Amino acid sequence: MKILYFVFVALFAFPRAAFCQNTEKVIYDEKDSTNNYYLALPPRSGNIQGVQVLFLSFNTPEYILPETRLPNVAYANDILTIIASLDTSLFADDALIARISKILNHVVKRFSADTSKFALGGYEYAGNIALRYTELCYEHPEEFSVHPKAVFAIDCPVDLVELMHWCEREIKKNYFGGNVGDAKYISNALTRELGDLSSNREKYIRASPFYKDGQHPGNEQYLKDVPVRLYYDTDIGWELETRRNSYYDTYIPDGSELINRLLLSGNKKAEFISSKLPGMRSNGLRNPHSWSIVDETECIEWLKQKLDIFDPRTYSPAYYLSLPGGWGVEQFRLPPDFARELPYKGIQDVRFAPGWGDAKSEEYWAYAYLLWLEAKPLINAQALQENLKAYFGGLVARNIPVRKIPANKLVPTVTAIKKIKTSDGDTETFSGTVSMLDYMSQTPMVLNTVIHEKKSPETDHTALFFEFSPKPATHAIWTELNKLWTEFRIKKR
């Protein structure tokens, strides 16, 4: 078993029942007795690299679980999923904005989440709210601690003025009962909260993410630099046949116009997504107003890209590090989840000898890793010694509960590093030892190590290469480990 276990996209690998068991109900406001919680599904790895917050209206958070596999795919890709209901809200008023901020701030504190790694998603009316909230975050950045890096909305009305016109048409048409009932409810609710449209149009415009008839950039201008996606079921034939809705009786015209305005403003990250499959509810009924119009795997891949979440499958290193036959490899972003205190940012690229996990092998615990570090971190013997202690101490600590290691077998992690004669091509070279618990055999162990440093002026990166083995320096394994370094090259741009 390797040091880290990466889980890639697994759309059908985990049954929905498993997610119900792993989903946590989190109370964020003890004073609110009506709707004071959200659902949280941490990633399988426990390593939260990003957060997707899914909002819905007119239902409880639990409603989402059988309707979409977005939480499933996020679970397998180091993304924390938060699901929150916005009750019967149709737009983002001041109270709702404050409530969303309270939820997001609670998530940051509860899960130690990075505020720069949030994406918001909303379904139908909650989608309109997610868009407007994101706009406000960039219109008044000083008032919000979380600024969404991406936002997407599913089958959502983006223009409240046009939504009222839709209500008028549906009530007059009086064809499909569901639409007529919704139109009456929405019309009454918006009139009650914003006033009559004819005399309060400005209130509707201010509350909308977008106003189609505006002659100048409106609220949408604050999405100019934000990745935005709008998802719609564009099967107009079905709308005409079953509900007597033309193209103009859907949310599609306004949604597509919003995306077009963003594209014209220079936002190349704005996308209109036409569903590849017809919208279906979990009960098997055809309905364009469904979470299922989102391709969950593709959406999470998009989120990972926009949130800058490392993916080994698509990683294109700026260096060459060989992989001998039979050796294992793992790559992940720094700092690792088991040693968050490490002052490193960048990528760790690991090479495991074939016998790394075999206690009977001469290659037991023989491995090497490259730290491809951003900028210019402090590197000297003392810093390396402290950081290795944090790294291996955290690694052992993470394995204690997993392997059920009894307390009487634990030993302190002790590191000793010194600077030695600089090897050819190195900026500096170090060597030393790591005394620790071998969590596989559950016995004390001393790892010998050689550390090479090389700076890359072209890429403003630093390469730190660590070689490890419990064998003495005269053992043949060190020749193999050192060969990895001597063949290491930084690619030219």
Task: Please tell me what each predicted stretch does.
Residues C20-G46:
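N-terminal cap/lid segment of alpha/beta-hydrolase-fold proteins
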Residues N59, M164, E168-Q221:
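Mobile cap/lid helix-loop segments that gate and shape the active-site cleft of serine hydrolases
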